[in-house]
């Protein structure tokens, strides 16, 4: 019998949460390549005409998103295409396109992308806003800001201000906030098997504590009636449902909203390690890799009442 690439403690945990054989199968498969058309520079129709050698399949939950495959050759090097260098499209995993779609920023909004690097979601937000309004694209890592700046420039983003700061120091209130939080990446194992080597329960606990601090900061930065979207590419309950449950208990004016998308979803986890979470968390979107053949993702939409 072949030995699993997953640690024993990992298997013990996940076998209680999902169909582990399916999770393992999809986590060890190559991701389908996907792109998002950058409508700041080109229309969907125009890009399709330029990529005639490539088969583009619509991603149901994102109008500008497509899975991409060469019609005749076994090519995966879409990053080398001139259209990519010119910023006509962004190479972005299909599930990663969901949080900006859920946030749904308008052209007159003041938006905070709290952990913005390397910029996939920032550029998506800018495209949705048609380069209007203002995006504060923030990160606390100086090294990561370099890639953010390059991607914003390549994609022709002109409504974003890059900041290197902790969000609690902003003397601003935002209409919309995206908190795509640092996480364990357990939903994105198929992108990097290194995740399996670095995974351990102690690091999950540390990340959960950080995420709780970040979501409190984000909620405090939100205007009344504003919208906060929290997301991770983790499938750990402690990084997802537990963080949202923590926020709901701390702020009575934090209200979860339903997420309605054309996507297969799995039930939110309402109990883990003898902890019971609010039934409101059923409104969150939990996606396992096997649900839609994507990365695993978790998304919550919160309104400040």
Label each residue range with its predicted role.
Residues 1-305:
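S-adenosylmethionine
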